[in-house]
């Protein structure tokens, strides 16, 4: 059954999600998504502050002038569509089929954004004089290089000592059904770009060259087998994965002059980036390699333990869905890593993530409406 057949039956969250999906906001574009949200929020008393940094559109919206500050955080940008011929429906023409809303960004994360807005509208209507503040931190640079997005907004807020108490990020945390998993932390991320130097030459005259691939092979073997830590009750053991490796000219008769290797750590709170860097560079020295290495720090690990935010989220999911959630720290990074270092408690709660970044991305229509109910209950638990 098509969208047209369902249009009269869809709820307010689904309708707003459709309006957002229809804006082709491939990162770092926003395409008016934040304006649409801002209009709805301004109508219920939010002060809207646009923060544009180079090609990135950000929005800081706040209702209230006192603490505590509850912040909804998310992004309006989406990943590219991929092969259009593999989509059942056009990715920027939101379509409902058999109870699922299809479109790029349906699950990641325009559905969450719509649920946040609708939940806030309902909450403010019931509690116009609520204590504390409600805020929205929205960016169009989460799926891209994450240079001019949330991190720049946080820098601005920190410079004027404007603090967030609790942040709820709308990333699609659920796995099999809505709310079965929330993310109450994330591992740190550290990337290395390593160049091992050699001497280029003819393969028939190896004594006149120095093969960096041969030299680096024992190091790479040891690196891949190194045990970094045991993890802990909240985080799995630190993982290192080689992501890219390149050497040679493409010719079969040339010994390469350099080998380039990119590898990434996803690390627990049992180690620090500094410890990992020291151990890798000690290993490089032990293998007597001539090398250059560039480190890129992508985010600290963070953890939101027992407390008001986790309690409120557990209560909301149980009340709306009838089952308990499972807090986890697995998966990739999110913009929560930029908010947590300020001292804010951060959680991620959003739709099922089975189709994110794929062709035919979709979200269950009923889940969108239930997600807004979860968000509303969380607001009531924390600000009433």
Curated annotation (Swiss-Prot):
Q: Say if the entry is tagged with keyword Zinc.
A: yes
Q: Report the top EC class in one word.
A: hydrolase
**UniProt cofactor note:** Binds 2 Zn(2+) or Co(2+) ions per subunit.
The EC number of this protein is 3.5.1.18
Give the catalytic activity. Answer: N-succinyl-(2S,6S)-2,6-diaminopimelate + H2O = (2S,6S)-2,6-diaminopimelate + succinate
Obligatory cofactor(s): Zn(2+); Co(2+)
- Provide the residue positions that the database annotates as binding Zn(2+) 2: 108, 143, 357
Superkingdom, taxonomy of origin: Bacteria
User: Which biological process terms from the Gene Ontology are attached to this UniProt entry?
Assistant: diaminopimelate biosynthetic process; lysine biosynthetic process via diaminopimelate
Q: Where is the active site?
A: 77, 142
- Pathway per the UniProt entry: Amino-acid biosynthesis; L-lysine biosynthesis via DAP pathway; LL-2,6-diaminopimelate from (S)-tetrahydrodipicolinate (succinylase route): step 3/3
Q: Which GO terms describe its cellular component?
A: cytosol
Q: Which family does it belong to?
A: Belongs to the peptidase M20A family. DapE subfamily.
Known function: Catalyzes the hydrolysis of N-succinyl-L,L-diaminopimelic acid (SDAP), forming succinate and LL-2,6-diaminopimelate (DAP), an intermediate involved in the bacterial biosynthesis of lysine and meso-diaminopimelic acid, an essential component of bacterial cell walls.
Q: What is this protein called?
A: Succinyl-diaminopimelate desuccinylase
Query: Organism, per UniProt?
Result: Shewanella oneidensis (strain ATCC 700550 / JCM 31522 / CIP 106686 / LMG 19005 / NCIMB 14063 / MR-1)
Q: What is the lineage of its organism?
A: Bacteria, Pseudomonadati, Pseudomonadota, Gammaproteobacteria, Alteromonadales
Its gene? dapE
């Amino acid at each position: 059954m098509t969208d047209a057949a369902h249009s009269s039956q869809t709820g307010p969250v689904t309708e707003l999600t459709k309006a957002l999906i229809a804006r082709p906001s491939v990162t770092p574009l926003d395409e008016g998504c934040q304006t649409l949200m801002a209009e709805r929020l301004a109508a219920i008393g939010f002060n809207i502050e646009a923060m544009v940094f180079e090609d990135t559109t950000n929005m800081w919206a706040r209702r209230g002038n006192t603490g505590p500050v509850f912040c909804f955080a998310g992004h309006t940008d989406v990943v590219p569509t991929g092969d259009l011929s593999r989509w059942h429906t056009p990715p920027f023409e939101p379509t409902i089929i058999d109870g699922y809303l299809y479109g790029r960004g349906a699950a990641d994360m325009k559905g969450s954004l719509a649920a946040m807005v609708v939940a806030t509208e309902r909450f403010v209507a019931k509690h116009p004089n609520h204590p504390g503040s409600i805020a929205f931190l929205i960016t169009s640079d989460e799926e891209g290089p994450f240079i001019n997005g949330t991190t720049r907004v946080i820098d601005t807020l920190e410079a004027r000592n404007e603090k967030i108490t609790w942040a709820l990020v709308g990333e699609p945390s659920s796995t099999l059904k809505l709310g079965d998993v929330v993310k109450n932390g994330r591992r740190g991320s550290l990337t290395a770009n390593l160049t091992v130097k050699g001497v280029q030459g003819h393969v028939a005259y190896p004594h006149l060259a120095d093969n960096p691939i041969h030299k680096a092979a024992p190091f790479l073997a040891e690196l891949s087998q190194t045990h970094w830590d045991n993890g802990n009750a909240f985080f799995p053991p630190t993982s290192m994965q080689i992501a890219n490796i390149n050497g040679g000219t493409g010719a079969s008769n040339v010994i390469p002059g350099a080998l380039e290797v990119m590898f990434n750590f996803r690390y627990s709170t049992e180690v620090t980036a500094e410890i990992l860097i020291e151990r890798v560079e000690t290993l490089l020295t032990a293998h007597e390699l001539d090398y250059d290495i560039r480190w890129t720090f992508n985010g600290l690990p963070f953890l939101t333990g027992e407390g008001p935010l986790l309690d409120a989220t557990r209560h909301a999911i149980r009340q709306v869905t009838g089952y308990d959630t499972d807090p986890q720290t697995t998966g990739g990074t999110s913009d929560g890593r930029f908010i947590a270092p300020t001292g804010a408690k951060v959680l991620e709660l959003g739709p099922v993530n089975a189709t994110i970044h794929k062709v035919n991305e979709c979200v269950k229509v009923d889940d969108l409406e239930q997600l807004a109910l979860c968000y509303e209950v969380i607001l009531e638990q924390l600000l009433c």
